[in-house]
């Protein structure tokens, strides 16, 4: 057989681009333990907190909502004569700070929790904010389990609390029952058909992951000096499937995917004359495609909150701009549909604890011509 007619065998392996997602679904798993697990690994709240810490758009919206919900001032009726106005417990927590924490948890997780401490007469003596990340519940939401290390199994140091019941007949309770109800949990959630709440942006979690991945890609592209997509040729013959897989796996682990901002292709050739040739491997409009994807993801996140970007200092339509009147009208609608309902939930929670109406007052977030009424 002549050299021209010799059949050449080229072994080729392409490393597919790999965009790792660690999406944790909000599953509710009933196990042999007393509480219902919240997400894979019982760590759905931890996953949402990670998104908040790493997705700029999500963090901006939630932080803005916290400011809007807390308003310009928060006041509450004093808890007896023990504390000065606005102080809610022996730790010295102010009602304004507690409302901010509740607003954050509601926007981040879809619910919030408060710990209520009673005195020896059964009266409410102290109120504490409880981080929703650390709360798990039984199916009926009448027993709660507190642990700061659910992500590590949460089998140790679990504190059990009953549901807060305002109208307990304290005098008729046994000593054991009084001890059990001396500290209880008020658990507020935005859905009543499942054990745990659901964040408003649940449908846009994938968009959050995309924005997070794009930021990671650009960061690593910068660290890698914007190295272009390339093909790697091994021109010393076919080493066999096992060794090829080992080489490809090693390269893939080190260099492929959004976390390294580049993509490799590998070719195993008999010699240099057999090397694979590829033209125009790099996409000319790559950066534009990323930009379009990033903008689409950002819009999806805003849509999940029913929010307008201009309320949070971002004008995505730079060709038009916006006026003060447009901002005020947009804010009034957003305040009525998205902010005041959360303020009402928080105010109602304190009404339930105190056993009377109008104990908490939130002064609305002020605009120059704001005429909103107080929430109490």
PLM segments and residue spans:
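Structured, contiguous alpha/beta core segments that scaffold functional sites
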Residues: 1-66, 70-269
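A contiguous, surface-oriented mixed alpha/beta subdomain in the mid-to-C-terminal portion of proteins
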Residues: 190-349, 359-364
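Extended, compositionally biased alpha-helical segments that mediate assembly or anchoring
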Residues: 373-376
